[in-house]
Amino acid sequence: MSSLKKILGLKGKGKKSKKLGIAPPPYEEDTSMEYAPSAPIDKSYFGVDEMDTYDPNQLRYEKFFFTVKMTVRSNRPFRTYSDVAAAVSHWDHMYIGMAGKRPFYKILAFLGSSNLKATPAVLADQGQPEYHTHCEGRAYLPHRMGKTPPMLNVPEHFRRPFNIGLYKGTIELTMTIYDDESLEAAPMIWDHFNSSKFSDFREKALMFGLIVEKKASGAWVLDSISHFK
């Protein structure tokens, strides 16, 4: 987890990272991940003695490198961004992946959807409408989700069908996100969005299961994750 000093690019004593590696999960496993786990807070439980107590009012900052590659194929062209968001937001249906990265993946899927561009018809597969994007960079996220687990440089790939109203097709996503331990300043993740595609940011974020609020400064903060999406 990056400190606020690192986010703002302030110098300080460098600390050696103690984060441990986490192997990617076996994607062939059939166990359902559709539940909301909650960590115990009783200090007598295993592994809890040094765990940070979750405080929903405590603002934290996470700094990271990210890459998102997205391809969306639909049976017909999307008319509005709302149509795009309704389709792409189904990317994590029956999610099996690194649980600690899921909130960040939701943000990357939201980000990618705002930057989608139509593939020229002559290049599309059998003339089927196709959209693509490739975004990468460094960013930080202000949030109130408590202490986050270590994030290593391990790409994960997701392929999901969607069938929303008049639209049906497939979503292909490859996402990578990992901790940035540098002292260099980074922009907020929201700065990478193409905000010209929509004006109701809070409403569109909720379509991806992201509950966001504005700070007094006007900056968006990720408050929590909706378990209904």
UniProtKB/Swiss-Prot annotation:
Biased composition (Low complexity): 1-10
Biotechnology: VSV is used as an oncolytic agent for cancer therapy, because of his wide host range, rapid replication and mild pathogenicity in humans. VSV used are mutated at M51R in their matrix protein. These mutated viruses cannot successfully infect normal cells, being unable to counteract the antiviral state induced by interferon-alpha in normal cells. Cancer cells are impeded with responsiveness to interferon, and then can be successfully infected and lysed by the virus.
Membrane topology term: Peripheral membrane protein
Mutation effect (residue 156 to A): Loss of host NDUFAF4 binding. Loss of host GTF2H5 binding. Loss of ability to inhibit host transcription
Secretion signal span: none
Alphabetized UniProt keyword annotations: Apoptosis, Eukaryotic host gene expression shutoff by virus, Host cytoplasm, Host gene expression shutoff by virus, Host membrane, Host mRNA suppression by virus, Host nucleus, Host-virus interaction, Inhibition of host mRNA nuclear export by virus, Membrane, Phosphoprotein, Viral budding, Viral budding via the host ESCRT complexes, Viral matrix protein, Viral release from host cell, Virion
GO cellular component terms given for this protein: host cell cytoplasm; host cell nuclear membrane; membrane; viral envelope
Motif PTAP/PSAP motif, residue numbers: 37-40
GO process annotations (BP): phosphorylation; symbiont-mediated perturbation of host microtubule cytoskeleton; symbiont-mediated suppression of host mRNA export from nucleus; symbiont-mediated suppression of host transcription initiation from RNA polymerase II promoter; viral budding via host ESCRT complex
Effect of residue 27 to A: Partial loss of host NEDD4 binding
Record bears the keyword Lipid metabolism: no
PTM field: Phosphorylated by host.
Subcellular location field: Virion; Host endomembrane system; Host nucleus membrane; Host nucleus
GO molecular function: structural constituent of virion
Motif mapping: PPXY motif: 24-27
Region described as Disordered: spans on this chain: 1-23
Sequence motif: dynamin binding, positions: 2-4
Recorded consequence of changing residue 96 to A: Loss of mouse GTF2H5 binding. Loss of ability to inhibit host transcription
UniProt subunit comment: Homomultimer. Interacts with viral nucleocapsid; this interaction contributes to the virion assembly. Interacts with the viral envelope glycoprotein; this interaction contributes to the virion assembly. Interacts with host RAE1-NUP98 complex. Interacts with host NEDD4 and TSG101. Interacts with host dynamin. Interacts with host NDUFAF4; the interaction inhibits viral propagation and is independent of interferon activation. Interacts with host GTF2H5; the interaction may inhibit host transcription.
Domains: entry comment: Late-budding domains (L domains) are short sequence motifs essential for viral particle budding. They recruit proteins of the host ESCRT machinery (Endosomal Sorting Complex Required for Transport) or ESCRT-associated proteins. M contains two overlapping L domains: a PPXY motif which interacts with the WW domain 3 of NEDD4 and a PTAP/PSAP motif, which interacts with the UEV domain of TSG101.
Reported function: Forms a double layer around the helical nucleocapsid, the inner matrix layer binding to the N helix and the outer matrix layer binding to the envelope glycoprotein. Plays a major role in assembly and budding of virion, by recruiting cellular partners of the ESCRT complexes that play a key role in releasing the budding particle from the host membrane. Condensates the ribonucleocapsid core during virus assembly.
Family classification: Belongs to the vesiculoviruses matrix protein family.
Full protein name: Matrix protein
Gene (UniProt): M
